[in-house]
Amino acid sequence: ESGADAGLVLQQIRQAIRFHRKFLASDQDRHKRIHWFDPSWWQRNIKKLFSRPKTAGFGYTAAAWRRSSQAVFRAAGQQKALLASPPQESTGLPNTLPLSASLGYYNLHGVPDSAEWFGQRAFNDPLIGPDYPVALTPANLRSNGHRPDVIFSEACYGANLRDEKTTTSSIALRFLSIGAHAFVGSTCTSYGAVTMPLAGADLMAYRFWKLLR
């Protein structure tokens, strides 16, 4: 974040320390409670070994890229439909929605001189409205005690922090300020596929989610 105030950086450091301390404590506690001759313990852990926990995800895409975005979202273990813009716009977006899931995937337009991310109308969309509506702004991300753990954004300039970006002028910084552990995004232009097969940023996002799982 720009300026002399290191508050956001210090917040990230404290958050990382808390996370790793909590993880270490739970790991030590788990080892203390292991009962090697307890059949129920073996049964529980064998089930865990061969099953993947379901993690809630939130996906938001430009309507023009819905098909390729859905393929990427499935790689994150998400079978539900993504939110698409249009018809969704930032003004009608519930503030709790982007913060309600552990994983956040965004395939929207971004520009270097604006804090907003934009949707894009599908070529055959009959609805009346702007071709590139504002889909998400930092104001949509209000701290409410919930936050995603990991965000992957394909937006052009989605992780661009030049030109004195702050939590009110950067969605990436806004996510981090409310407690997200990681934000993956582009500092420049980012290209993907309109439809299948996946390419460019879409393929990178697909492999990211696959490996993260």
Regions found by a protein language model. Give the residues of each.
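Generic hydrophobic/packing signal
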Residues: 11-13, 61, 108, 148-149, ...
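Alpha-helix capping and helix-coil boundary motifs
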Residues: 2-5, 89, 213
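Broad hydrophobic/π-residue packing in well-ordered secondary structure
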Residues: 8, 106-109, 203-208
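Structured catalytic cores of large enzymes
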Residues: 1-78
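Catalytic-core segments of thiol-dependent peptidases
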Residues: 46-49, 53, 57-169, 188
